[in-house]
């Protein structure tokens, strides 16, 4: 179990820090504990190219560290969470990065140890 939890920045954080030139500040804050899921890494690459943020790419990759891919069983939970997050008319992949990150964090004890609300029923806020 890690001494301190990993930090999972989302794409918006990465873009904003890159636009402001503050990725090094984020890296100092994360202190080597950065991680990102494959969808967030893909979203970063797409945004990097669209917004011409290539100069920040190496720092973002160093900040985020290892890319974590969903395991087979996690894909089912990701799709279920995506379904609950989507609004009518949303593109199919809207919120995929958030859903993937949440599922990976909640399913992998090695990232945060035992999560207190792991027994919480999805979408109800109830335990049990």
Language-model features: locations:
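Active-site-proximal, substrate-binding regions of enzyme catalytic domains
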Residues: 2-111, 118-128
